[in-house]
């Protein structure tokens, strides 16, 4: 028997329990992997708390790294002993071992260790679709990024800088401001004491920005629209402060024929070939050193409840990994 973090009811971190599970053998098209490291993401809190309802009891986590133990029939591109990682897969990463569709697994290059991989897959693939597909960031762009010191934020700001863009980041305090500045943000706004709409206008000389990447949601979204140039894109990819209130679409016309999108990784990575192409770009920018993955906190997997509490309290910065 192996162990996993599961929850039988929604609620706070206290609903997470460490229990024995029977993993079983992989079926057709599946692989069994033994985790070495698991990524922590804010979406895990949404799932645990019931914001995104799941059938219960449920496992948790969509990002991890480890070693293939066994493959099912029809799996030809993986074998036992392969180092793999994933970030676009069914939930269940908070476990010592699990079964997973083999086409969701990505072989890791030798240059990327397991802890780094577990910290970068979901977040890095999210950044890939945001800046390479949702709005294709190009040299000369000035962009606005909320939560710039978070796991996604640190990767996005570095990658966008690598592409030749100027990144304006918002953060909650001076410590996070320093971190964002060190990881690609040319300008940092501490939203607790500055009006980010006014500052964006000042920084851009009134031109505003072509895209806002917003994972905060309720507290920032409407003001984010005021930062966009005509025909600009508001990419809402999270809601750490709560869901955005219903919006009168006429507002988008008034503010300059704006576009609003609520993209998800599962949509962009639905096809195996799309997932592999996205991962190839991610692995290249990390291996080249253009993007550095900063694992700033680690917890034992069995202590996932503590990790959730710290993440919700905004005590963490960068990426957090649960070690198995």
Residue ranges and their predicted role:
Residues 152:
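Hydrophobic/small residue at the entry helix of a nucleotide-binding pocket
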Residues 171, 219-290, 324:
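Glycine-rich phosphate-binding loop and adjacent beta-alpha segment
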Residues 22-39, 49-92:
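Glycine-rich beta-strand-centered segment in the early N-terminal region that forms part
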Residues 272-324:
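C-terminal hydrophobic helical "lid"/dimerization subdomain
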């Amino acid at each position: 028997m192996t162990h996993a973090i599961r929850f039988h009811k929604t609620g706070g971190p206290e609903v997470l329990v460490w229990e024995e599970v029977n993993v079983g053998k992989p079926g057709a098209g599946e692989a069994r992997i033994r985790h070495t490291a698991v990524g922590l993401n804010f979406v895990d809190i949404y799932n645990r708390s019931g914001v995104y309802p799941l059938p219960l009891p449920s496992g948790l986590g969509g990002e991890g790294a480890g070693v293939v133990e066994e493959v099912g029939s029809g799996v030809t591109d993986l074998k036992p002993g392969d180092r793999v990682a994933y970030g676009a897969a069914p939930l269940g990463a908070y476990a010592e071992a699990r079964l997973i569709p083999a086409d969701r697994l990505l072989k890791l290059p030798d240059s990327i260790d397991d802890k780094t991989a577990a910290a970068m897959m979901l977040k890095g693939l999210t950044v890939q679709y945001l800046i390479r597909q949702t709005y294709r960031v190009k040299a000369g762009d000035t962009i606005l990024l909320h939560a710039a010191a978070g796991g996604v934020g640190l990767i996005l700001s570095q990658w966008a800088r690598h592409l030749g863009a100027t990144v304006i980041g918002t953060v909650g305090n001076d410590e996070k401001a320093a971190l964002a500045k060190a990881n690609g943000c040319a300008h940092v706004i501490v939203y607790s004491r500055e009006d980010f709409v006014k500052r964006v206008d000042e920084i851009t000389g009134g031109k505003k920005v072509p895209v806002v990447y917003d994972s905060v949601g309720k507290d920032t979204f409407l003001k984010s629209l005021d930062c966009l140039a005509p025909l600009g894109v508001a990419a809402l990819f999270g809601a750490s402060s709560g869901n955005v209130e219903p919006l009168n679409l006429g507002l988008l016309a008034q503010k300059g024929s704006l576009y609003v999108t609520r993209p998800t990784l599962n949509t962009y990575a639905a096809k195996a070939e799309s997932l592999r192409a996205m991962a190839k770009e991610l692995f290249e920018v990390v291996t080249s050193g253009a993007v550095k993955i900063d694992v700033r906190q680690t917890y034992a997997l069995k202590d996932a409840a503590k990790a959730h509490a710290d993440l919700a309290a905004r005590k963490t910065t960068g990426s957090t990994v649960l070690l198995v």
